[in-house]
């Protein structure tokens, strides 16, 4: 499995709990969506909610052959917790694997500005989210509810007499 070359985290780390979603963008120039998912040299991950967004992580990948398929598991693992990845193209195998990990691949035209895409996501969050965004919000809410249920069960277990 081909790992990422570098992962850069923002310090001090923004509180990821303040964001409704994490969204990834494939980019070479770090300003525009301009890469195919499978061959992207860089992925930027942002946290976003209705009122603001923040860069959380930048991931760089080594240059490898286009025919190497064992790169996908590491790339998808790097996107863990992301609701979507914006890219110019994405292969069928990658789409299947991304969807299996509840990450929506979103194809956009080459050169789309990342900050404009974040503003559009925020606008939709303030309104009535549809499509993948609506599904991602429901999934995030369910995950949060499941985690709080697990914590409640653990607290009850700890309160029991042994």
Predicted regions and their residues:
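Mid-chain, well-packed structural core segment of small domains
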Residues: 77-108
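Non-catalytic interface/targeting segments
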Residues: 1-76, 106, 112-162
């Amino acid at each position: 499995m081909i790992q990422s070359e570098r992962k850069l985290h923002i310090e001090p780390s923004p509180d990821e709990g303040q964001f409704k979603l994490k969204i990834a963008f494939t980019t070479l120039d770090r300003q525009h969506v301009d890469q195919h998912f499978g061959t992207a040299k860089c992925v930027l991950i942002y946290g976003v909610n209705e009122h603001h967004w923040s860069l959380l992580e930048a991931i760089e990948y080594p240059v490898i052959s286009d025919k190497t398929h064992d790169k996908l598991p590491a790339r998808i693992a790097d996107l863990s917790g992301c609701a979507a990845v914006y890219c110019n193209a994405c292969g069928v195998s990658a789409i299947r694997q991304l969807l299996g990990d509840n990450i929506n691949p979103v194809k956009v035209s080459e050169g789309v500005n990342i900050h404009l895409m974040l503003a559009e996501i925020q606008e939709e969050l303030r309104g009535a989210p549809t499509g993948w965004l609506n599904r991602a919000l429901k999934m995030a809410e369910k995950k949060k509810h499941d985690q709080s249920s697990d914590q409640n069960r653990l607290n009850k277990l700890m309160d029991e007499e042994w």
